[in-house]
């Protein structure tokens, strides 16, 4: 499965990059996120509960950031284990383009699933991934614009 999108964030690139590395902001924006902790400068561990069609699962996962070209570009890779529900793993390439006082965020993500999740079918997985991505970025935009305080977003 592959997802790609472009979102305009109402903040300068450096602020957007910092926010995308802020554990509290990420935890507030990630749908179903129960725990998110920084293990190192480039590694996060998380517990997330998600419902995909009829399957509800609690995933334990790890995300690794490659900031070698930051803040213009960075890559993420991650995997999560949902027990009997299956697993998900993927990679994403993110580009942050300065546009005056705003930032254009472009991403391309590739993911694969296994177990019960994979049996649900590609269309359901893709539509759920798009919905979750939209929820993340809507909340992220509201936090970055000041429309919602971080405490309210949690």
Predicted regions and their residues:
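Glycine-rich portal/gate segments that line the openings of hydrophobic small-molecule binding cavities
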Residues: 37-79, 135
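Hydrophobic/aromatic beta-strand elements that line small-molecule binding cavities or substrate pockets
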Residues: 5, 34, 61-67, 90-98
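Short strand-connecting beta-turns/loops that link adjacent beta-strands
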Residues: 12, 41, 70-71, 99-102
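Beta-strand/loop substructures that line and gate deep hydrophobic ligand-binding cavities in soluble
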Residues: 80-127
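A short, glycine- and basic residue-enriched loop/turn
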Residues: 33-36, 62, 114-117
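A conserved amphipathic terminal alpha-helix motif
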Residues: 114-154
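Hydrophobic ligand-binding cavity/cleft-lining segments
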Residues: 1-43, 47-51, 139, 154
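Intrinsic-disorder/low-complexity, polar/charged segments enriched in Ser/Thr/Lys/Arg/Asp/Glu/Gln
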Residues: 2-6, 43-45, 58-60, 73, ...
């Amino acid at each position: 499965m592959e997802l790609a999108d472009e979102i305009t964030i109402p903040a300068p690139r450096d602020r957007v990059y910092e926010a995308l590395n802020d554990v509290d902001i990420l935890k507030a924006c990630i749908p179903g996120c129960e725990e998110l902790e920084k293990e190192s400068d480039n590694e996060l561990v998380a517990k997330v509960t998600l419902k995909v069609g009829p399957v509800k699962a609690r995933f334990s996962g790890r995300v690794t950031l490659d900031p070698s070209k930051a803040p213009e570009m960075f890559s993420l890779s991650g995997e999560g284990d949902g027990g009997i529900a299956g697993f998900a793993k993927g990679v994403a390439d993110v580009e942050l383009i300065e546009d005056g006082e705003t930032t254009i965020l472009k991403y391309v993500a590739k993911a694969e699933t296994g177990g019960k999740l994979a049996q649900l079918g590609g269309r359901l997985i893709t539509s759920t991934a798009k919905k979750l991505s939209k929820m993340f970025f809507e909340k992220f935009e509201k936090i970055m614009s000041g429309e919602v305080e971080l405490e309210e977003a949690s």
